[in-house]
A protein has these predicted regions:
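N-terminal start-of-domain structural block
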Residues: 1-5, 81, 221
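Conserved histidines in hydrophobic membrane contexts and catalytic metal-binding motifs
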Residues: 198-201
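Internal alpha/beta scaffold segment
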Residues: 206-221
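Charge-rich, low-complexity segments
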Residues: 1-42
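Small-residue-enriched alpha-helical segments and adjacent helix-cap loops
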Residues: 24-31, 46, 51-195, 215
């Protein structure tokens, strides 16, 4: 699990300050909903029929006890006492008030969490096998590789305005618990010529038109 360094802390602090100002402008009428939409989506905020929803990133599905306690506290203080874990290992709060969301983001930052790139047409949360690090059939722990991809793709300028959202998953076991074939790119860690390599699946997806990805590379060293 990645722990924030000074750069991470400052980066998230500035992002949260910017969004706090954007929320104030929206509530005061300084921004229309159309103007506010791309700004809120960059911070994981959706507009539902009756309320806003905040989706929080849980990189490769790994939470510490401290982070889980913080999520429970946020649910009690700002929502209805519960959250909704998603298929791709995030958590959603479905009833926060817009005015409270900047405070929620600040609370998340206290435990090295944020909601960046959990919505919008960008590279989304990188997921992995939920038994990573503990599975008996694991060839390699996929979490360090998922973390490298997460760091590389977060706030990358080339990935902020993609045609559609883009999803990546990594597994290190022969049993596909990470459902890598249902992702735009699925990476399977495996032995290749006596060393660690990767099998690459591409073109998968769920949603309205689910499709299984196809193998692009059988084993890259």
């Amino acid at each position: 699990m990645h722990r924030y360094n000074a750069f991470d802390e400052e980066f998230v602090r500035v992002r949260n300050e910017q969004f706090r100002d954007q929320v104030k402008r929206r509530l005061s009428g300084g921004l229309t909903e159309d103007e506010f939409k791309p700004l809120r989506l960059m911070n994981g905020v959706y507009l539902q029929l009756h309320a806003y929803m905040l989706r929080v990133a849980i990189p490769y599905g790994t939470l510490s006890s401290r982070q889980l306690h913080k999520l429970a506290d946020i649910a009690d203080r700002f929502d209805k006492g519960y959250g909704h874990f998603t298929t791709r290992q995030n958590i959603q709060f479905n009833w926060p008030r817009l005015i409270d969301i900047p405070d929620i983001l600040d609370a998340l930052a206290e435990v090295n969490m944020h909601a960046i790139q959990t919505s919008g047409n960008t590279i989304r949360n990188v997921t992995a096998d939920h038994l990573a690090g503990a599975a008996a059939d694991e060839i390699e722990d996929p979490r360090p590789y998922a973390e490298l991809i997460r760091q590389w793709s977060t706030d990358h300028p080339e990935f902020q305005f993609l045609p559609r959202k883009f999803k990546i998953a990594v597994t290190g076991a022969p049993v596909d618990r990470a459902v890598i074939r249902a992702h735009d790119i699925g990476l399977e860690l495996l032995p290749v010529e006596g060393a660690l390599g990767v099998k690459v699946w591409v073109g998968g997806g769920l949603g309205r038109t689910p499709i299984l990805g196809e193998v692009r590379h059988q084993g890259l060293p």
